[in-house]
UniProtKB/Swiss-Prot annotation:
Signal peptide from the UniProt entry: none
InterPro entries: Resolv_N
Keyword DNA-binding included in the entry's annotation: yes
Name under which the protein is recorded: Putative protein PinH
Protein family (similarity comment): Belongs to the site-specific recombinase resolvase family.
PROSITE patterns noted in UniProt: RECOMBINASES_3
Highest taxon of the lineage: Bacteria
Record's keyword annotation contains DNA-binding: yes
An MF annotation (GO) of this entry: DNA strand exchange activity
Example GO biological process: DNA integration
Length: 47
């Protein structure tokens, strides 16, 4: 899964909001609480 995280981080650096994608991916591991109103940029700190 790490390669996916790196890819999302690269896209995030380009200013793309992946909130919906992050919810579908990360909610399965950490639950919806960590994903609400956040971008993948915020979530990479958790990863």
């Amino acid at each position: 899964m790490w390669h996916l995280v790196v890819l999302l981080e690269e896209l995030c650096e380009r200013g793309i909001n992946f909130r919906a994608l992050a919810q579908s991916i990360f909610a399965q591991q950490w639950g919806d609480e960590c994903c609400k109103s956040k971008t993948i940029c915020d979530l990479k700190v958790i990863v």
